[in-house]
Amino acid sequence: NFKAGVLERSGGVIGPQLVVGPMYHTGPLSGTRQLIAGVSSVIMARFNAEKTLEAIQEHGIFSSIMVPTHFVRLLALPDDVRAKYDISSIRSISHTGAKCPVDVKREMIEWFGPVFLDAYGASKVGTTCMITSEDWLRNPGSVGKAVPPFTARILDDDNNDLPANTEGKLYFEDATGRGVIYHNDPEKSAAAHIAPGVFTLGEIAYMNEEGFVFITDRFSDMVVSGGVNLYPAEPEQVLIHHPAVLDVACIGVPHKEMGEELKALVIPKEDMDLPSPEVMIAWCRERLSHYKCPRTLDFVDDLGRNTMGKINKRKLRAPYWEGVS
């Protein structure tokens, strides 16, 4: 049955899978299950952008599971390096783990073709939303529609359903009634639910008239400055396109008058003329409403992204909040 399912999803054709991420994560681990269907797996000891292209060509790789950080590193390869390798065997790249910037995914589709499948969810519950490249090109930035047994709902602070294109808390209703279960943590499991089988993974989102979900931020990452809700993802999506920025994260830090304010933490690119923090903030303000932009900016060496491309913003915030009651 598993093999039949794999063949059905792949149009009756299967081939080698490239595993580029750690197998303790549900994405790469789920890929190795295709061994049951007779699909061979090529496992990389650690991710390297050019070696990934080399493996695709050498082994005729059919599919892989990646995260947006892998995409960014692949796109950073010089054009002459990209041109060296034949990637025409690739038929499917699923991506998960973190939100993918629109420009990054668009560039990957232009390079690899419409082979991408965004699978949004969590290890504790599986995939809750999915979107093909074709649907994504019509709805750029979306993580797709809810997949059975889940129904997506956007709720306000009183847990009322919100109309289309209105931002709120993203919940899923599980038709099986199971919901999300955190291992050995019944309190956390209970806190994620507002009713049996109705749970959240902690995201802020909106849903259009067709049911496509667009994630904008996380509850825990939201910054409240002077009573105004600020979403770090917005300035992050602007600053990541500055030519001197390699990576960026925005967090809330203490402010005596406003309660907290936005701070950008930027990893600069090497061999670039580095502008001052003030110049970079001004650059952001030219492209985004002033109140949504960071008030301060620090250059850092590391943001602590894990192997699946996620940042623990609680750890990033901690030094700034130490001693603040």
Q: Where are the predicted features?
A:
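Adenylate-forming
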Residues: 1-5, 17, 30, 53-55, ...
